[in-house]
Amino acid sequence: MNKWVFCWVTLCLLTVETTHGDGGIITQTPKFLIGQEGQKLTLKCQQNFNHDTMYWYRQDSGKGLRLIYYSITENDLQKGDLSEGYDASREKKSSFSLTVTSAQKNEMTVFLCASSIRLASAETLYFGSGTRLTVL
């Protein structure tokens, strides 16, 4: 592999912000998370789009996105298809936290935060770069 390509790929992997064409940013922290079985783990998401609705999704290898929680505004939490084993918190319009209440042994997954805006009859979701969780 060319050293410039390697440097570019490395830089992309270390970036925790996803910038979208209209200048908005979704930041997920941490980028990588290693935990132990039974541990409570918290993931954070910030957006500066001024979007009302935010989401947390889980994506396991070989599977599509599964909705964990979403929030239409501050202090409003709606359970998704996969909310068992998770808690969420949204005290400000710009931030949405997700807590894995009890990490499962050998769990390896990616969590994705998104925010959305509805224009006319279409809704566009803007995604963060993801948090990769590994449980030992």
From Swiss-Prot:
Any one biological process term the GO annotation gives: adaptive immune response
Top-level taxonomic group: Eukaryota
Keyword Ribonucleoprotein found: no
Region described as D segment: spans on this chain: 117-120
CDD domains on file: IgV_TCR_beta
InterPro entries, sorted: Ig-like_dom, Ig-like_dom_sf, Ig-like_fold, Ig_sub, Ig_V-set, TCR_beta_variable
One Pfam family here: V-set
PANTHER family, sorted: T CELL RECEPTOR BETA VARIABLE 19 (PTHR23268:SF28), T-CELL RECEPTOR BETA CHAIN (PTHR23268)
Full protein name: T-cell receptor beta chain V region LB2
Organism: Mus musculus
